[in-house]
């Protein structure tokens, strides 16, 4: 289940008529990236370009909006900014929060009249150094008259490295004769794993490097 949300405002759409690409039927299975879906997706894209089809539409849609969760938990990617609110003398890591993040992006969609869909998306979250790109292939149809499309697609999603850091100081003893120690938590590079699909994107965090010195 997706924990985040993306609210974007389309700043413009450009349509271009092209010939000839199409695909009448499509069958994709949602598997891991190491499965057969990669080969199947490649065959679908090649087949869609080779088949004689009907006119299609290529749309370019810039996006500008906000991206992320409310305060109090991890966002869609599972990585947040550390917001230290505890005193430095407490032996406790600062809590996390996930503010709304400015987002810029671009969607390039290729949608044939007979349903073949190919979409490329590039998103960048400004305050978190997040960069996400996805390539989707699938089938789209119109549930009613008009320009509304309902699409079913699968593909691959790649995310850039994210830097997350936290710094805190803990004091274990007080007084002249009692031992005390201080600890320091350095920043780490997090790399979310690539997942298959559009609605699932998680990240595994790794432990920080701790340096302790006793006096």
Curated annotation (Swiss-Prot):
It comes from the Bacteria. To T.pallidum TP_0127, TP_0618 and TP_0619. This is Uncharacterized protein TP_0315.
């Amino acid at each position: 289940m997706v924990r985040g949300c993306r609210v974007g405002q389309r700043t413009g759409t450009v349509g271009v008529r092209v010939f000839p690409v199409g695909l009448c039927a499509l069958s994709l299975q949602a598997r891991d990236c190491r499965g057969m879906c990669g080969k199947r997706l490649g065959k679908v894209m090649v087949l869609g370009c080779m088949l004689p089809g009907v006119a299609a539409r290529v749309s370019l849609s810039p996006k500008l909006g906000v991206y992320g969760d409310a305060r109090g938990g991890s966002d869609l990617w599972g990585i947040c900014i550390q917001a230290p609110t505890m005193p430095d003398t407490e032996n406790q890591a600062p809590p996390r929060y996930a503010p709304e993040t400015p987002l810029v992006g671009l969607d390039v969609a290729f949608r044939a009249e007979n349903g073949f869909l190919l979409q490329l998306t590039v998103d960048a979250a400004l305050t978190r150094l997040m960069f996400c790109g996805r390539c989707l292939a699938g089938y789209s149809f119109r549930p009613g008259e008009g320009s509304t499309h309902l699409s079913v697609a699968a593909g691959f999603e790649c995310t850039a490295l994210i830097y997350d850091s936290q710094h805190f100081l803990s004091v274990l003893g007080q007084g002249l004769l009692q031992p005390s120690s201080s600890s320091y938590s350095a920043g780490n590079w997090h790399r979310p794993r690539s997942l298959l699909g559009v609605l699932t994107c998680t990240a595994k965090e790794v432990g920080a490097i701790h340096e302790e010195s006793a006096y």
